[in-house]
UniProtKB/Swiss-Prot annotation:
Region (Disordered) residue spans: 1-29
Cellular localization per UniProt: Peroxisome
Annotated protein name in UniProt: Long chain acyl-CoA synthetase 7, peroxisomal
GO biological process: one example: response to salt stress
Species of the source: Arabidopsis thaliana (Mouse-ear cress)
Length: 700
């Protein structure tokens, strides 16, 4: 007599609660038994995700999967299960879309800007073989690491495809990384070759003797006659991209395709503290993540995608893999974010994936224009906006009348064809999301993920009009919430379970490169990755991010503080562009450093009749500080912050937190230790002010 394995019994239990009978809705053939929620104590229907019949060690039923694939985690594209690697994915695209436009750029060889010129999928395939063969010509071997140290342009993706075809490991570097970080990554990954541009070449040459593993530097956009000559004995060859192409074409090599379990890339996370960590991702990891995402969001050969987010970031990388699978045309921005709107007008993309930072700028620009347009136009916009919003809320198709009268002009700001907007990397305000949906008449979806999960952990589902959450689990993973008692978050919380978000599935990275200790800190023995983010389950199985565990600290009285939660509240203040919350175990209260919005400050000062010579002087005016802190307090009360979570003092600064002043990571997260040191004097003064004005000492 044969006994079923635990895995088989678990699968049968799940299937027993699923009705696979035919329905009119062919988009999803899996539906939960109508009696499941009442007949079973552990398997119930949520609109977008399901709770599995898996009892955890804690005795709780707390593992969620996407409703679209509850019985099996997705690891391959459902329509093309033969695609197991990035190489397979590109081969599929070339075979299917060889003559289609693929890579477009406005930047001419002489540096001038014109119309987009395009390379087809077939042409890109030919170039990737030449680049791969050129690397072999220079002694780069299968399994060696190859660096990419330049901003988005067609050559970046060609090199990445070459790495996949010949089983090299691609290692992207942010072009904004400082010399020390670049040096660390090159040495830590033991890079054999690195692709750069003339600007980043100068950085590499400044410490060439300190990166001994490098044997080949390829300069993209540089002419051979302008390349520097290196002294004999360095062991390093510098060639132009065009020369490498020529060398490769003269000696083409057959591909050396990787296996799904082979390393595809090592992505170095910028990190808010310490040195960068190398996230090891396999071909199987990346394919699984994008395949899972494709179950819900689909790209088509008719789509045009604008690429401006750093390709060194996993968000943009995953979008490109999805684009290849769908045969999408990718147009690159000209390299200047301040001219991005001009690129939109010329490219007229249908897909726009960005971060809240830019969406907020679009929102501010449109609302500012509406406010200054006059009473009649402002009122017309409000009527059109509210009418369209109400239709969306009620599940009706908004009248095209309002688009013709009001919104088509706004749509033209992004080229007039955008059908899909994606947002990630940080939370998008619900107000901004609703605004984008209404004004641009397109699908706007927010996702949540991290480099260690190959990108997407969860994303909003098509047709879900509720904002303020990050959707249901990617069909390629399962999610659970783990109690964090020190922050008073538990999966028993009512009305919504809360806890640290943990993820498991084929999307989970293999570990940090050469760092077993930090790998063990984030990845447990059962394969669960602990994200450090705090989430809750909303009705319908939607995940909402509410806090951050990793950056918590204690105040003197023992209360735990999650600064990012508080900063997200305060950045809604009209005066606040950026906010840094500081506290420590020596003080019982928090203080805030606020980078102000210059235009709002100037307008407010003018309305109050306050005279000043420069923005710095205005920031130091006690009346201004008092007003800003009062508005921050109002937002804190509205968000129901606890008493000890309120900032008791604020310092206003005219300059923004930037990559250049060392206060932000390349993904625009605050570097807390650096910010603490940078603003040490201001922090000390604020605590002195609190102590002087409060009979109860702030220090314990």
């Amino acid at each position: 007599m044969e006994f079923a394995s635990p895995e088989q019994r678990r699968l049968e239990t799940i299937r027993s609660h699923i009705d696979t009978s035919p329905t009119n809705d062919q988009s999803s053939s899996l539906f939960l038994n109508a009696t499941a929620s009442s007949a079973s104590p552990f398997f119930k229907e949520d609109s977008y995700s399901v709770v599995l019949p898996e009892k955890l060690d804690t005795g709780k039923w707390n593992v969620y999967r996407s409703k679209r694939s509850p019985t099996k985690l997705v690891s391959r594209f459902p329509d093309h299960p033969e695609i197991g690697t990035l190489h397979d994915n590109f081969v599929h695209a070339v075979e299917t879309y060889a003559e289609n436009k693929y890579l477009g750029t406005r930047v001419r060889s002489d540096g001038t800007i014109g119309e987009y010129s395009w390379m087809t999928y077939g042409e890109a395939a030919s170039e990737r073989q030449a680049i791969g063969s050129g690397l072999l010509f220079h002694g780069v071997n299968q399994g060696d690491c190859v660096g990419l140290y330049f901003i988005n342009r067609p050559e970046w993706l060609v090199v990445d495809h070459a790495c996949a075809a010949y089983s090299f490991v691609s290692v992207p570097l942010y072009d904004t990384l400082g010399p020390d970080a670049v040096k660390f990554v090159v040495n830590h990954a033991n890079l054999q070759a690195i692709f750069c541009v003339p600007q980043t070449l100068n950085i590499l040459l400044s410490f060439l003797a300190e990166i001994p593993s490098i044997r080949l530097i390829v300069v993209v956009g540089g002419a051979d006659e302008h390349l520097p000559s290196l002294p004999r004995g360095t062991g390093v060859t510098i060639v132009s991209y065009q020369k490498l192409l020529s060398q490769g074409r003269s000696s083409l090599h057959p591909f050396s395709p990787p296996k799904p379990e082979d390393i595809a890339t090592i992505c170095y996370t910028s990190g808010t503290t310490g040195t960068p960590k190398g996230v090891v991702l396999t071909h199987g990891n990346l394919i699984a993540n994008v395949a899972g995402s494709s179950v819900e969001a689909e790209f088509f050969p008719s789509d045009v995608y604008i690429s401006y987010l750093p390709l060194a970031h996993i968000y943009e990388r995953a979008n490109q893999i999805m684009g290849v699978y769908g045969g999408v045309a990718v147009g690159f921005y000209q390299g200047d974010v301040f001219k991005l709107m001009d690129d939109f007008a010329v490219l007229r993309p249908t897909i726009f994936c960005s971060v809240p930072r830019l969406y907020n700028r679009i929102y501010d620009g449109i609302t500012s224009a509406v406010k200054s347009s006059g009473v009649v136009k402002k009122r017309l916009f409000e009527i059109a906006y509210n009418s369209k919003k109400q239709a969306i809320i009620n599940g009706r198709t908004p009248s095209a009348f309002w688009d013709k009268l009001v919104f088509n002009k706004i749509k033209e700001k992004l080229g007039g064809r955008v059908r899909f907007m994606g947002s990630g990397a940080s939370p998008l305000s619900p107000d901004v999301m609703d605004f984008l949906r209404i004004c641009f008449g397109c699908s706007v979806r927010e996702g949540y993920g991290m480099t260690e999960t190959s990108c997407v952990i969860s994303a909003m589902d098509d047709g879900d009009n509720l904002s303020g959450h990050v959707g249901s689990p990617n069909p390629a993973c399962e999610v659970k919430l783990v109690d964090v008692p020190e922050m008073n978050y538990t999966s028993d919380d009512q009305p919504y379970p809360r806890g640290e978000i943990c993820v498991r599935g084929p999307i989970i990275f293999k570990g940090y490169y050469k760092d077993e200790e930090q790998t063990r800190e984030i990845l447990d023995g059962d394969g669960w990755l602990h994200t450090g983010d705090i989430g809750l389950w909303l009705p319908g199985g939607r995940l909402k991010i509410i806090d951050r565990k990793k950056n918590i600290f204690k105040l003197a009285q023992g209360e735990y503080i999650a600064p990012e939660k508080i900063e997200n509240v305060y950045t809604k203040c009209r005066f606040v562009s950026q906010c840094f919350i500081h506290g420590d175990s020596f003080n019982s209260s928090l203080v805030a450093i606020v980078s102000v919005d210059p235009e709002v400050m100037k307008d407010w000062a003018a309305s109050e009749g306050i005279k000043y010579e420069h923005l710095g002087q205005l920031c130091n005016d006690p009346r201004v500080r008092k007003t800003v802190l009062a508005e921050m307090d109002d937002l804190g009360r509205e968000a129901q912050l606890r008493g000890f979570e309120f900032a008791k003092a604020v310092t206003l600064v005219p300059e923004p937190f930037t990559l250049e002043n060392g206060l932000l990571t390349p993904t625009f997260k605050i570097k807390r230790p650096q910010a603490k040191a940078y603003f040490a004097e201001a922090i000390s003064k604020m605590y002195a002010e609190i102590a002087a004005s409060n009979p109860i000492p702030s220090k314990l």
